[in-house]
Amino acid sequence: MARRPDDPPIDSHGFGPQVISLFLRLVLVAGVSLRGAPRAMATISEALGLELAVPCWTTGRLWLLRLGHAMLTAELSEADDWAWLIDHSVQIGQEKCLVILGIRLSDLPERGQSLRHEDLELIELLPAKSWTRGEVDQALEKAVGRTGHAPRVIVDDHGVDLTGGVALFQQRHLETVEIYDAKHKAACLLKSRLEKNPRWQEFQTGVGQTRCSVQQTELAFLTPPAPKPKARFMNLGPQLAWAKRVLAIVRQSRRAGILQSVSAAEALPSAARLKEKLGWIEAFADDLADWSQWQQVVDVAVASVNEQGVYKGAAALLAQRFWQLDALGESAKQLAGQLVEFAASQECRVRPGERFPGSTEVLESCFGKFKHLEKQQSRGGFTQLLLGFGALLAKVTTATVRAALQTSRTADIRSWAKQALGVTVFAQRKLAFASATEMG
């Protein structure tokens, strides 16, 4: 198809900023795969009679990497009010990637609004095979060169290597304080209550057995959600919600004799069948009431920190929100008290008039979005596509696309990958299989 006269190519790229922006928005905003984006563009072009020039997916991939590289190397404001959010991303292989995102305290969204991807700057993206406390400290010191000053605050999940590295960094930068991510703290409190609780262990056993026994039967629609392999106590909500709904269904079926049909064509299983496979949940009715209240308390705390941040008065606001919850049991009140105490300990680190981010949840969200971008490739370890992480934070407009492609070249991508990644797991696999084929 012809190039549109109102979208002249950027330098020697052969495509204009409008087409490039459309490709990137399909991938970054709409969640279309890199290979699927050209097909989507061709479909849109044909349906609307736009006569768009459609790029190859490999060309679009390079645009994505160059946008990410531009975000990683963009000039940042030199200021002493930076907040850094730090965490590791892990994939197959030995490497872990340390990611540092940042936002100036003066640029935080108003209270009541959570941080968004586009609010943040990419300060560092550092894959490495080893992350000791000393190595984290060195990485943080290197990142100071990007912002001109040590950050006012670093928010992390208190992983041993991260918090240890931050402690070493603080010995040289006394003005920097550390904030413990609220969601991880809440998950630790739940873990301390549940992990060794015999009733919880029995419940988990029942959930696992139910998943195996009903997923290939007429009760498949009641299959419990699969547990998260990591961060289990940060993701209890779906499982508890499932259990409460199933408990209500079992009780309703016992009263009615049979459930109402979902459609006129097919009736749902009988009360006897439901009791056979799911009746065990009734024995956990009281436990579920307690556990669900604990989850409710945690959800309120995490939402409050995400939307309000850490400031003088944050603990009082959280206590007020807990007071507004209906009929909390004694154990839930104790958990709420622990979370208020935690909020008070965090706000002691804030000066009057300051407000800090209190959560790395937006960074965790970026990790999730990046894994969606990688799709199956995440099973092959980190590759050049790691640079695409920076593109997740970009506001994709024709202006930002033009600027990125003019400042970050393909040669820059290759140079960064060679220095940061070396020989990747994917490259090792390719070489090994090639040599095995030749020998065969």
Set out the residue ranges of the language-model regions.
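Enriched - but not universal
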Residues: P38, G60, R66, L85, ...
